[in-house]
Amino acid sequence: MNEAIIQLDHIDITFRQKKRVIEAVKDVTVHINQGDIYGIVGYSGAGKSTLVRVINLLQAPTNGKITVDGDVTFDQGKIQLSADALRQKRRDIGMIFQHFNLMAQKTAKENVAFALRHSSLSKTEKEHKVIELLELVGLSERADNYPAQLSGGQKQRVAIARALANDPKILISDEATSALDPKTTKQILALLQELNCKLGLTIVMITHEMQIVKDICNRVAVMQNGVLIEEGSVLDIFSNPKEALTQEFITTATGIDEALEKINQQDIVKHLPANALLAQLKYAGTSTDEPLLNSIYRQFEVTANILYGNIEILDHIPVGDMIVVLEGQAENILAAEKALHEAGVDVSILKRGA
C-alpha cells in the first residue's frame, strides 16, 4: 500500500476584507497517496483551488497542518521550513493551469529551459534535458516554434514539460483542460495518465467537470462552499454517491439526466401498464458479467425492456447503469427485485404502472 505523499489536516483558510470575513476553506482533511491521480471537484467558489495552493504554500492556511513527502511544512500557525528548504520543496511540486502562461517571445524549448535557470545542471545537460522533456510530452518536432505557432493542446504540452523540468514528485493541474476542445482534452488526459505510470508522478486534478474525474482519477474529493462533503475512490463515489451535489455531478458526467428526460417522453413510459414499473439498475464489478435480465426472465417470467444502458470503466472496474421497464406479475417482480439486489445490483424504482 502506498504511503501518503500529501497530508492536509484540518485546514482552515480565512480571508479578511475590511469588515468582511471570508471562510474559503473550513476544516478540510485530505490525504493523497504516492502515485494517486486525485481529483478535487466542485463548482466555482467551492474552495478547491485555494485548498490546493496550500500544498506548496503559495497560500498559507489560517489553521491546520501540512505534510508533504514526509516533511511538515506548516503547523501551529506558521511555516515550518527555512526559506531554502521551502524553495526546494516547491521544486518538487509542478503546476499547470488553464492559461498556459508561456512567454510569447520564447520558443517551446526556451520556455521549458526557463524553468531550469536555477538548476545546477551544465549548459549541455540543460539542453539534453529540454530535448528529453519535449520528447516525453510528444512535442520534440515543435521545439523551435513560438507559442503563436502552436495549438492550445500543444501549448499545454509545453507547459507540462516546463512543469516537469525540475523532476517534481507531484504535479498539480488547476483546470488545465478547461480551455481545450473535447478531443484535445482527452489527449492531454491520456498524456497525464502516461506520465503518472511512467514517472510514478502523483497528480492532483482540480476541476469542475466530473467527466475528467471519471476519465483519469482513482480517488476524488467533492467540495462545496469551502467544505469537503464527500471523499473516496472514484468507483465508490460513482456507484454510491451520498450527497446531492455529488449525485448532480455524476448525472451530468454520465448523461443519464438527459437520457431520463427523453425516456419520460416515450409512450411506453407515459402509459406504463399496471403490471410494469420503470427502474434504474446500477451495478459494478462482476455483476456486469452476468446475464441478469435473462436470468430474471427464466426464473420469474419478468421481462425487461431496456430503454437506456451504459458501461464505464472506472479505475479498471466496469460500472453499469441501465434504465428498464420490468413487466410481469406483481409477486414475480418483487422476487426479481430481490434477486437483483442479492446479485449486487442497486434497483431504484422511478415509476410504477397505473
Swiss-Prot record:
It is found in: Cell membrane. The keyword Coiled coil does not apply. Residues 8-250 form the ABC transporter domain. ATP binds at residues 42-49. It is an enzyme of class 7 (translocase). InterPro entries: AAA+_ATPase, ABC_transporter-like_ATP-bd, ABC_transporter-like_CS, ACT-like_dom_sf, MetN_ABC, MetN_ABC_transporter-like, NIL_domain, P-loop_NTPase. Signal peptide: none annotated. GO terms for cellular component: plasma membrane. It is a peripheral membrane protein. GO terms for molecular function: ABC-type D-methionine transporter activity; ATP binding; ATP hydrolysis activity. It catalyses: L-methionine(out) + ATP + H2O = L-methionine(in) + ADP + phosphate + H(+); D-methionine(out) + ATP + H2O = D-methionine(in) + ADP + phosphate + H(+). Its main location: membrane. Its EC number is 7.4.2.11. The keyword Membrane applies. Keywords: Amino-acid transport, ATP-binding, Cell membrane, Membrane, Nucleotide-binding, Translocase, Transport. Gene3D superfamilies: 3.30.70.260, P-loop containing nucleotide triphosphate hydrolases. Belongs to the ABC transporter superfamily. Methionine importer (TC 3.A.1.24) family. This is Methionine import ATP-binding protein MetN. It comes from Streptococcus pyogenes serotype M2 (strain MGAS10270). The lineage of its organism: Bacteria, Bacillati, Bacillota, Bacilli, Lactobacillales.
